[in-house]
Amino acid sequence: MMEFAVNFDGPVSFRYPRGAASDILKSIRTPVEHGKSETIYKGKKIALLSVGAMADKTVGVYERLLSDGYTSELINVRFISPLDEEMIERISSGFDYIFTFEDNIHSGGFGAILTQRLTENGCHALVKNFAFPDTYIEQGTRQQLFERYGMDSESLYNKIKDLLKNED
């Protein structure tokens, strides 16, 4: 992203969460294209959309679902603005379940914006946004906070499995 920002003719903003950056997707990265998301793994029925620092948690969920026999699509949402309209159009009709993962609060985040766009596109998928609650977040390490608010890979996986179980 830094190389993209240096070469982009216009303003660019980064969000740097506290802690070290994950390199979990480093070996499968594609060049950054302005306003475009990155499809890490193609899949069917379930789309997992990860924003920023949630990549490592989302990959953990993806791997657990894969071991259960679900071939989910894993998408790295590189840009919040502009949104990847082609990706939104594609997932609007191609999936039964769409899950977003972001380390922000629910209100006004990527998941809320995406849900609005999906609704406008007539999407009939079950959409669930995973984010922190719209409340004061207590102090703690990133790991402590993710676990406390159910945003760690294990908790996210269990929530999704419950949703899938209830839909079958």
Which ranges hold each PLM region?
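Thiamine diphosphate
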Residues: 6-168
